């Protein structure tokens, strides 16, 4: 029954024991920031998943099957956004200048659900510094499953590259952390 909230286990992720960096990444699979997070996780063989609209709907058509996403029962973007916020421990929003549309909704849902939120303005930092900020956020808030959100590609053409670089660097930090026995 897809009307019931997912658990991290249903998404294929484990909240696991305490550690310094996340054990899984989720997003809604939209073009831009969402898909970049999944691409970075898949490239690093890092656990990922999340919720997407029914029919795997995105602005570029159907979200490719290579992205391990579960479908909500409706085609509404807000429903999948709400599920990803609720089923994660905290959210990273990567954006440029101002929050708008679904990105603004994600921030509002985090506040409503009392979920930790880290905002990264690409105009104010570079991907390496941003990843360190996110690592500190994840550590401070005890986040095991990190939701990643931000503008779709049509709203910010650089969202894919910047977000992929941030999440890729974060996952490299996670690997180094694990290699040093901190996980």
Describe the residue ranges of each PLM region.
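Divalent-metal-activated hydrolytic enzyme cores
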Residues: 177-183
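Acidic/glycine-enriched connector segments
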Residues: 11-145, 152-155, 159-177
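Compositionally biased non-globular segments, especially hydrophobic aliphatic-rich helices
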Residues: 8-10, 182
């Amino acid at each position: 029954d897809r009307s019931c909230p997912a658990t991290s286990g249903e998404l294929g992720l484990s909240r696991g024991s305490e550690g310094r960096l996340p054990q899984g990444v989720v997003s809604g699979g939209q073009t831009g920031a969402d898909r970049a997070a999944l691409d970075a996780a898949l490239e690093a063989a890092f656990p990922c998943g999340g919720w997407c609209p029914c029919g795997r709907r995105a602005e570029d058509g159907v979200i490719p099957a290579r992205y391990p996403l579960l479908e909500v029962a409706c085609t509404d973007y807000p429903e999948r956004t709400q599920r990803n916020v609720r089923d994660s421990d905290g959210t990273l929003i990567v954006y440029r200048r101002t929050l708008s549309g679904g990105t603004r909704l994600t921030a509002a849902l985090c506040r409503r659900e009392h979920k930790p939120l880290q905002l990264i303005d690409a105009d104010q930092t570079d991907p390496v510094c941003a990843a360190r900020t996110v690592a500190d956020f994840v550590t401070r808030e005890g986040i095991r499953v990190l939701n990643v959100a931000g503008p779709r590609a049509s709203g910010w053409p650089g969202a894919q590259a910047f977000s992929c670089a941030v999440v890729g660097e974060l996952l490299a930090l996670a690997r180094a952390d694990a290699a040093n026995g901190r996980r």
